[in-house]
From Swiss-Prot:
Activity control: Inhibited by ruthenium red or its derivative Ru360.
Parts of the chain that traverse the membrane: 305-326, 335-355
Protein's name in the database: Calcium uniporter protein, mitochondrial
Ranges in the topological domain labelled Mitochondrial intermembrane: 327-334
Position of sequence motif Selectivity filter: 332-340
Biological classification of the source: Eukaryota, Fungi, Dikarya, Ascomycota, Pezizomycotina
Biased composition (Polar residues): 83-93
Outcome after substituting G343L: Strongly reduced calcium channel activity
Gene coding for it: Mcu
Chain intervals with Basic and acidic residues compositional bias: 61-82, 426-435, 452-462
Example of a GO biological process term: calcium import into the mitochondrion
Mitochondrial matrix topological segments: 34-304, 356-484
Function: Highly selective calcium channel localized to the inner mitochondrial membrane, which mediates calcium uptake into the mitochondrial matrix. Mitochondrial calcium homeostasis plays key roles in cellular physiology and regulates ATP production, cytoplasmic calcium signals and activation of cell death pathways. Sufficient to operate as a pore-forming channel without the need of calcium-sensor or auxiliary subunit.
Natural source organism: Metarhizium acridum (strain CQMa 102)
Free-text domain note: The selectivity filter, in which calcium ions are arranged in single file, is composed of two acidic rings separated by one helical turn along the central axis of the channel pore.
Amino acid sequence: MGHVLGGTLLAANRLARPPAVVLGKPRVCCWRASPWPVIVSSALQFSSSSARHTNYTSARYEARGRSTTQRKVDDRPWHRESSGSLPKSTSPDPTGGDATKGRLLTTPTRLLKLILPIPFHPEQEYINSDETKTNKPKEDAVEPLALLVHPQQPLSYLERLIQAEIPPLLVKDREKLPEIIFRAEADYTGGNKSNDGRREESNGNGSNVASYSGLGREGPSKGDTHWVRWSGSTEIGDFIRDAARGREFSVTIEGHAEELRVAVPSFKDRTYYMRMRLRRMSQEIDQMATVKRECDLLAHKGAHALAKGGFAALAAWWGIVYYVTFHTDMGWDLVEPITYLAGLASIMGGYLWFLFISRDLSYKAAMNVTVSRRQNALYQERGFDPAKWDQLVHDANGLRREIKFAATEYGVEWDEMKDLGGEEVKEVLEEEKGGKARKREQEDEDGDGDDDHDHDHDHVSHGAELQGQDILHANEAAANVPGD
């Protein structure tokens, strides 16, 4: 009954609702239960079918626009959104204010950081497109491109990196990757003509000898320079070392009229971080060397004092034996067996001690044991870490070797004393280097001796085995002979 009454009241309420009155654009509906009219927006008058059609059309155009934008973002990095309105950098300008010249910087690692200005507009689709787009204000230009490369990578790898960051070249309605050409200053000029028409060689070493210079960008500017193209298979490090005879090298992009100039790093630039690390290590080595020198001196003094004490004990023993033998009533008959037993006991004790330390029976071995124990005790007392010392010396010698190798390749003289901080640090490094070399040679000699002994033992064992086999075969042959 309740359901029937509820349905009747709902139907009556719907029949009592007045028709809508349209006043202009909005539609006003009057309700009996509410004293105020309700205004419904005209945007809700669309039917569901028209709304679906509109949504489908807008989604189609949005998908078309998004696919084009996404294609530009994926295929061409210079089309990224807001690529021309990036925030201003607070770090110093690595190009030195010259937006048309690149820089090749040295990093704390072995990698090189190439900062190359991109001479194209962010909205430029092709290199050889309308040139009016390239004449935009400077604020719309793409920021310089930074690339990290290893000196042992070829120039072709750097070429691929640059091609991935610049627009393609349009050739016969088809996209083509532009060719990247690397040029450096040549070490020949083809001969300069003098006033009388004869040719003079500009290279004092001869026309068949390449000249090198580690000045790089620090070198003097030359008015008339000759350029040579380098193969893409050349390693970047070799190319830079050869290009260091001039102040810069050029990067030519196919389809772009102007070439990009990059400042060549000098020997000081290439080895800057290595020399800074060597200076820090040299200071730390100098401080640790002072502590180590004091500990070693005290340890050697203690070892010599111990040796002197042993000699004093032997001298005292000799004096006691002399006094008891010649100045007492006991005489030689009683002292003789005591001296024999004491000497034999000393020999047995020394033999057991050398057997315990597993070293050669020598004064040097005994001194090394006593000195090393005293050194370890002093190192622990003074806070000296031998493992850290060995690592520092090894790293410092490694840096010295790398810097010397770079100086040899650049053809310059390296002032080692300036970076090491003095002759004492150099002596410490050379001494540790020579000591490790001698220790390694001694270990190799000991290893060769053990190998020879093992080889002789194996040879004897093999000979005994062959002899045993011969005897066995002889016995078998004798057993097979028929008896008389």
